[in-house]
Amino acid sequence: MDKFWWRAAWGLCLVPLSLAQIDLNITCRYAGVFHVEKNGRYSISRTEAADLCKAFNSTLPTMAQMQKALNIGFETCRIGFIEGHVVIPPIHPNSICAANNTGVYILTSNTSQYDTYCFNASAPPEEDCTSVTDLPNAFEGPITITIVNRDGTRYTKKGEYRTNPEDINPSTPADDDVSSGSSSERSTSGGYSIFHTHLPTTRPTQDQSSPWVSDSPEKTPTTKDRASGGRAQTTHGSETSGHSTGSQEGGASTTSGPIRRPQIPEWLIILASLLALALILAVCIAVNSRRRCGQKKKLVINNGNGAVDDRKASGLNGEASRSQEMVHLVNKESSETQDQFMTADETRNLQNVDMKIGV
């Protein structure tokens, strides 16, 4: 029992240590723009996004910088913060990503927790997938920060980058549900107005670093209010169903997302796991102790009659002799039965002879 309580105390001591860790997954840089994910997806607030980019010696990208990154191949289906907006930057249409739209897909709400995009002005102008090995602008702190690059290399550093106390010690769970990583995109919460831009279906012959808004009014993406009678068209998106309806022409639309679920604190999950493990160990120890107590020991009495091996040999000989005696007894019983039958027949014959003589 003492061991059980000792292990439980040791597990409780490990809980805060396991929580004082931050994993930052980063992608390749496209014209200086890259995507950052913290501890799974969608766990970065607006204020933390700015602090995180600053720690990487970067800033939140502008719309023009995002569009330039898309022009050279940057694509992801993840919601993230940029300067003044929350965007999804898909290149190819996908029914479960930005409602089948392409370009810089903008959500007007920026109050929830998402991932973030950062822009490093000193990065190469094209694609750059070299590993990031440092968080240069992080300051001293107790947090273990691990940078996970696209190729799987990991670099760990002790420190802190968050300056907002609400980001360091959140008092309430995030508004949006945090889901595990996948290539598909979750739906945005209901009531958001969404704007988007279009990429051309074929690449133009002119310089691709030109502004993302065309000068010609025919090609300029427009934003129109498609509400009719006080009702706006609704786009229903879901990761699981993959169906979407509504406008895809750049008009304002709203999306309805899945039901929000409260987050379970990590320390509670770890504590429950430790308690379950301790309970299993306690049951195993109790069963093992009971089994040992219930075992029967075989008592061997020698009485000075030689070694145990000699007694085993004599016991085997005795068993053989007893089996032979049983065979003799069976043979003897069968012969006695035959003699009894013969005596009875002779007696009947003599009686018949006497009766004949008497007659």
From Swiss-Prot:
<feature type="region of interest" description="Required for interaction with EZR, MSN and RDX and for co-localization to microvilli">
    <location>
        <begin position="290"/>
        <end position="308"/>
    </location>
</feature>
<dbReference type="GO" id="GO:0031258">
    <property type="term" value="C:lamellipodium membrane"/>
</dbReference>
<feature type="glycosylation site" description="N-linked (GlcNAc...) asparagine">
    <location>
        <position position="25"/>
    </location>
</feature>
<keyword id="KW-0130">Cell adhesion</keyword>
<feature type="glycosylation site" description="O-linked (Xyl...) (chondroitin sulfate) serine">
    <location>
        <position position="180"/>
    </location>
</feature>
<dbReference type="GO" id="GO:0005902">
    <property type="term" value="C:microvillus"/>
</dbReference>
<feature type="glycosylation site" description="N-linked (GlcNAc...) asparagine">
    <location>
        <position position="57"/>
    </location>
</feature>
<dbReference type="GO" id="GO:0070374">
    <property type="term" value="P:positive regulation of ERK1 and ERK2 cascade"/>
</dbReference>
<feature type="topological domain" description="Cytoplasmic">
    <location>
        <begin position="288"/>
        <end position="359"/>
    </location>
</feature>
<dbReference type="GO" id="GO:0004888">
    <property type="term" value="F:transmembrane signaling receptor activity"/>
</dbReference>
<feature type="topological domain" description="Extracellular">
    <location>
        <begin position="21"/>
        <end position="266"/>
    </location>
</feature>
<keyword id="KW-0597">Phosphoprotein</keyword>
<dbReference type="GO" id="GO:0044319">
    <property type="term" value="P:wound healing, spreading of cells"/>
</dbReference>
<feature type="compositionally biased region" description="Low complexity">
    <location>
        <begin position="179"/>
        <end position="193"/>
    </location>
</feature>
<feature type="compositionally biased region" description="Basic and acidic residues">
    <location>
        <begin position="156"/>
        <end position="165"/>
    </location>
</feature>
<feature type="binding site">
    <location>
        <position position="78"/>
    </location>
    <ligand>
        <name>hyaluronan</name>
    </ligand>
</feature>
<feature type="compositionally biased region" description="Polar residues">
    <location>
        <begin position="199"/>
        <end position="213"/>
    </location>
</feature>
<dbReference type="GO" id="GO:0016323">
    <property type="term" value="C:basolateral plasma membrane"/>
</dbReference>
<feature type="signal peptide">
    <location>
        <begin position="1"/>
        <end position="20"/>
    </location>
</feature>
<dbReference type="GO" id="GO:0035692">
    <property type="term" value="C:macrophage migration inhibitory factor receptor complex"/>
</dbReference>
<keyword id="KW-0966">Cell projection</keyword>
<feature type="disulfide bond">
    <location>
        <begin position="53"/>
        <end position="118"/>
    </location>
</feature>
<keyword id="KW-0472">Membrane</keyword>
<keyword id="KW-0654">Proteoglycan</keyword>
<dbReference type="Pfam" id="PF00193">
    <property type="entry name" value="Xlink"/>
</dbReference>
<keyword id="KW-0732">Signal</keyword>
<feature type="disulfide bond">
    <location>
        <begin position="28"/>
        <end position="129"/>
    </location>
</feature>
<feature type="glycosylation site" description="N-linked (GlcNAc...) asparagine">
    <location>
        <position position="100"/>
    </location>
</feature>
<feature type="transmembrane region" description="Helical">
    <location>
        <begin position="267"/>
        <end position="287"/>
    </location>
</feature>
<feature type="compositionally biased region" description="Low complexity">
    <location>
        <begin position="233"/>
        <end position="251"/>
    </location>
</feature>
<dbReference type="GO" id="GO:0005886">
    <property type="term" value="C:plasma membrane"/>
</dbReference>
<feature type="modified residue" description="Phosphoserine">
    <location>
        <position position="314"/>
    </location>
</feature>
<feature type="domain" description="Link">
    <location>
        <begin position="32"/>
        <end position="120"/>
    </location>
</feature>
<feature type="modified residue" description="Phosphoserine; by PKC">
    <location>
        <position position="289"/>
    </location>
</feature>
<feature type="glycosylation site" description="N-linked (GlcNAc...) asparagine">
    <location>
        <position position="110"/>
    </location>
</feature>
<dbReference type="GO" id="GO:0042995">
    <property type="term" value="C:cell projection"/>
</dbReference>
<dbReference type="GO" id="GO:0005576">
    <property type="term" value="C:extracellular region"/>
</dbReference>
<dbReference type="InterPro" id="IPR016186">
    <property type="entry name" value="C-type_lectin-like/link_sf"/>
</dbReference>
<feature type="binding site">
    <location>
        <position position="41"/>
    </location>
    <ligand>
        <name>hyaluronan</name>
    </ligand>
</feature>
<keyword id="KW-1003">Cell membrane</keyword>
<dbReference type="InterPro" id="IPR001231">
    <property type="entry name" value="CD44_antigen"/>
</dbReference>
<comment type="function">
    <text>Cell-surface receptor that plays a role in cell-cell interactions, as well as cell adhesion and migration, helping them to sense and respond to changes in the tissue microenvironment. Participates thereby in a wide variety of cellular functions including the activation, recirculation and homing of T-lymphocytes, hematopoiesis, inflammation and response to bacterial infection.</text>
</comment>
